[in-house]
Design a protein with these regions (language model features):
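Conserved Rossmann-like nucleotide-binding pocket used by diverse enzymes
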Residues: 24, 42, 73
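A short SAM/SAH-binding and catalytic strip from SAM-dependent methyltransferases
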Residues: 39-53
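Class I SAM-dependent methyltransferase SAM/SAH-binding core
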Residues: 1-30, 57
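Core SAM-dependent methyltransferase catalytic element
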Residues: 118-173
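A short glycine-rich, Lys/Arg-flanked "PGG" loop and its adjoining helix->strand segment in the class I
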Residues: 56-68
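A short acidic, Gly/Pro-enriched loop at the edge of an enzyme's catalytic core
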Residues: 29-41
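A generic structural signal for alpha->beta connector loops
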Residues: 18-20, 69, 119-122
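C-terminal alpha-helical "lid/dimerization" subdomain adjacent to the S-adenosyl-L-methionine
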Residues: 73-137
Length: 173
């Protein structure tokens, strides 16, 4: 994170829970890691908070720091073109009335192109949807994990029945 107060809170929370975590202050467009030095780059509900130029810079940095075989995973809002018109409208409405200046622009981007423009091969892109783990049985969760992404009215909505969306790519080249 770039915000010292967020890092201080995270550190205090981790210590209170007895969890050893090392936090680093850094910007997503200049990660403090060597080339090909990490196995996983993960972001959660982060990209829609950035202007487009920083989103693209983040993908280039993720590609740079990932080892061969490493994985980029982004848990995010689903793209506009994956949803029914009403559901896309609902999220656009939420963007405007929730004071989210970059939310809609992000959702209008091509997620596969974000990956391929950063260096990932087109066939390395993946996307997945998963139900909220605490809402469904382990059997339903396992079944969801074994099928292709399915978009519905709960995808990306903060509700008890939320369907989480993730996308990314594996660096094989």
């Amino acid at each position: 994170d770039v915000a010292p107060p967020c890092l201080q809170y995270g550190h205090a929370r981790a210590e209170a829970l007895g969890t050893a975590i090392h936090f680093k202050q850094a910007s997503c467009d200049a990660l403090p890691y060597d080339d090909a030095s990490v196995d996983v780059v993960f972001s959660s509900m982060f990209l829609h908070e950035l202007p487009t130029h920083l989103i693209k810079a983040f993908f280039r940095e993720a590609y740079r720091v990932l080892k061969r075989g490493g994985v980029l995973i982004n848990m995010e809002l689903p793209p506009n073109d994956a949803l029914a018109a009403y559901d896309a409208f609902y999220l656009d409405w939420d963007c405007f009335y929730n004071n989210e200046p970059f939310y809609k622009d992000f959702r209008d981007l091509s997620y596969p192109n974000l990956c391929s423009d950063a260096g990932f091969a087109e066939d390395e892109f993946f996307q997945a949807t998963m139900p909220r783990y605490t809402y469904v049985s382990e059997t339903e969760f396992s079944q969801a994990a074994s099928r292709d992404a399915a978009f519905d009215a709960d995808t990306g909505r903060l509700s008890d029945t939320i369907t989480w969306y993730a996308f990314g790519a594996q660096k094989n080249g």
